């Protein structure tokens, strides 16, 4: 409750000025489940302008949706006005938002009953839609009619599968039937929003269960490049995903499992950042080499330790012989390298040019690469004079 107590000052201020205010959403759900709590959100009867007037330290992030970020003791909290939403456009966004004074109306518009629970500053639970019962049964149940909820915002179906992975809950029967029936509506959703949910699925502690449910509901058929991957996704669900430490590893392993031959094309279609694409592809390339050889000084140096550690964790899962000491050995080997990046070499291209009358050209990079390899193999000291002597001895200038 400590984190709620800090945010409770916001609720107290709102109530002192005649407004209702409650903790809502995922933080309340996770508090009931006894999971680590993420962002704490507050719903209130106060209008956005009233919230901003009461809290000088604020950021008006989404006034059209009634959301103001209030800074309390240096922590940001989303404070959102009770609202209802009118007819949805394109199965993804409401045509308009109306602010209301009723908590029940606000909770009624939410996706799942476990996310439609409110709590006051004293820890008293307000559960109008059976969210606690669903949590007790470990079930994911829509608020009201499942078909209506998914037609309002089709992303809710993907969120349902994501919660299977992150919470280990099961889909309630009517909720699952509605996903099977309306899965095609997911094609109306921006891929960026789907990617966020899919990544949470891949990194969830119950990822195997989530992947199985993705196939059982046929939702995978409405995701880019996955329509023909049913058996491969089920095969991926046979492995132990718990060893992965980053989402990069999870994506690299998933792409390996589905046999994606053009990972950068897949990732661009899923709207990944160039940085993330580069990392995932680098891990996949390292795994490809790792399948045919052990780590050595040159391979590890060229790969870089962070990519190498991720690649080794994925490789260990692939061969189903996960060995933590092998991963630790990669770090030890890297720590023992005479140099860990080219900038640490005690010679540069300018040095080479100053030792010869040759004009600059590709030969400079070639010689530097040979020096680099000799140092890494510990056949040459990383000292300028020793390097110069070796170059002259080998007639490389």
From Swiss-Prot:
Per its record, the protein catalyses: a tRNA precursor + 2 CTP + ATP = a tRNA with a 3' CCA end + 3 diphosphate; a tRNA with a 3' CCA end + 2 CTP + ATP = a tRNA with a 3' CCACCA end + 3 diphosphate
Per UniProt, Mg(2+) binds at 39, 41
> What Enzyme Commission number(s) appear in the record?
2.7.7.72
Q: Which Pfam families match?
A: PolyA_pol, PolyA_pol_RNAbd, tRNA_NucTran2_2
Residues engaged in binding ATP: 26, 29, 110, 153, 156, 159, 162
The residues that hold CTP are 26, 29, 110, 153, 156, 159, 162
- Which molecular function terms from Gene Ontology are attached? ATP binding; CCA tRNA nucleotidyltransferase activity; magnesium ion binding; tRNA binding
Does this UniProt record's set of keywords contain Magnesium?
Answer: yes
Task: Write down the InterPro entries for this protein, in alphabetical order.
Answer: Bact_CCA-adding_enz_type3_sf, CCA-adding_enz_C, CCA-adding_enz_firmicutes, NT_sf, PolA_pol_head_dom, PolyA_RNA-bd
The record's Gene3D superfamilies line, in alphabetical order, gives: 1.10.110.30, 1.10.246.80, 1.20.58.560, Beta Polymerase, domain 2 (3.30.460.10)
Keywords assigned by UniProt, alphabetized: ATP-binding, Magnesium, Metal-binding, Nucleotide-binding, Nucleotidyltransferase, RNA repair, RNA-binding, Transferase, tRNA processing
GO BP terms: namely:
RNA repair; tRNA 3'-terminal CCA addition
> Which superkingdom?
Bacteria
Cofactor names from the entry are: Mg(2+)
Family affiliation: Belongs to the tRNA nucleotidyltransferase/poly(A) polymerase family. Bacterial CCA-adding enzyme type 3 subfamily.
What is known about what this protein does?
Catalyzes the addition and repair of the essential 3'-terminal CCA sequence in tRNAs without using a nucleic acid template. Adds these three nucleotides in the order of C, C, and A to the tRNA nucleotide-73, using CTP and ATP as substrates and producing inorganic pyrophosphate. tRNA 3'-terminal CCA addition is required both for tRNA processing and repair. Also involved in tRNA surveillance by mediating tandem CCA addition to generate a CCACCA at the 3' terminus of unstable tRNAs. While stable tRNAs receive only 3'-terminal CCA, unstable tRNAs are marked with CCACCA and rapidly degraded.
Q: What else is known?
A: A single active site specifically recognizes both ATP and CTP and is responsible for their addition.
PANTHER family for this protein: CCA TRNA NUCLEOTIDYLTRANSFERASE 1, MITOCHONDRIAL
Quaternary data = Homodimer.
Q: Which NCBIfam families match?
A: PRK13299.1
Q: What is this protein called?
A: CCA-adding enzyme
Which species is this record about? Bacillus cytotoxicus (strain DSM 22905 / CIP 110041 / 391-98 / NVH 391-98)
